[in-house]
Amino acid sequence: MEESQGYLELNKFLQNDFLYPLLFQEYIYAVAHDHILNRCILSDNLSYDNKSSSLIVKRLITRMSQPNHLIISDNDSNQNQFLXHNKNFDYQNQMISEGFAVVVEIQFSLRLVFSLERKEIVKSHNLRSIHSIFPFLEDNFLHLNYVSDILIXHSLHLEILVQTLRYWVKDASSLHLLRFFLYEYQNRNSLITPTPKKSISIVSKRNQRLFLILYNSYVCEYESIFIFICNQSSHLRSISSGTLFERIYFYGKIKHLVEVFYTDFPTVLWLFKVPFMHYVRYQGKSILASKGAPLLLNKWKYYLVNFWQCNFYLWSQSGRIHINQLSKNSLNFLGYLSSVRLNPSAVRSQMLE
């Protein structure tokens, strides 16, 4: 447990970063405007006036600077709206989402530069990344027996989504603005597809840059907790009585570990070094494979369902996670059908006289 405490230490250098003032700088929205313009050119969709876009941005920044536009009361829901109903409504929505995405990317870039300066990435040269998909399929796939096909759930509660992002963005003002932005878009049925109980589906053809950041932050949070627990439990395989009691004690502490991760875990555990169980992800789909019997994957299947429900308030059914034997079924992954072919060997015996 002492080694695992190192993952729970907060990264102090990012706690004093204030990103909220950047949201009122014109050059941020100039970058966002160029991104939108390039995307519109590629899609041959120029539905707004380019000449008036800079004026719209300046007016938008001015309105964002006024606190009255960030207050919406129940009695006056149609007045003082932050996002007004006009012909430029869609463009303003895109500008705000793209601007926020640019600001959050700055935070990610600072974290990456800091890691490179401290040479923290060198520590992982002897471990297998969970995103090393092709080495996994080439080297490890042939030695596996059972595989669990998992579709990552993507319908999140708004507050859970904001709380997940706060591990990366320490500026409370920016997160409050994001919360207001998501709730306003949900009420107007513009940016997101609303689901019951104030949840959103992180799937949108528009504003892809912002939703890509939100989706990745959620997946990183999910993987950092789930893989860490898988990694810790896999070291308890001995059949001795001492290790058996250690295993029982560990599973009794799983709930505590999840709570600690959910409140204090600042970074993502990118590496998975378990030799008997393998995890790999591609976009919204992941697989969990094992060399042993299907009982182990069955256990983790039900745990994964409870994990999503308890930590992210995601309703998921165990029937959506399929466990297949590779010798009898093919795995549809990365557009390929992969399977393991058995090589039966003939055994010949001879009676001795």
From Swiss-Prot:
A single cellular component GO annotation: chloroplast
Compartment(s) of residence: Plastid, Chloroplast
Keyword tRNA-binding: no
Sequence intervals crossing the membrane: none
InterPro entries named in the record: Maturase_MatK, Maturase_MatK_N
Keyword line: Chloroplast, mRNA processing, Plastid, RNA-binding, tRNA processing
GO function terms (MF aspect): RNA binding
GO biological process entries: mRNA processing; tRNA processing
Family listed: Belongs to the intron maturase 2 family. MatK subfamily.
Role of this protein: Usually encoded in the trnK tRNA gene intron. Probably assists in splicing its own and other chloroplast group II introns.
PANTHER family for this protein: MATURASE K
Protein name per UniProt: Maturase K
Taxonomic source organism: Micranthes punctata
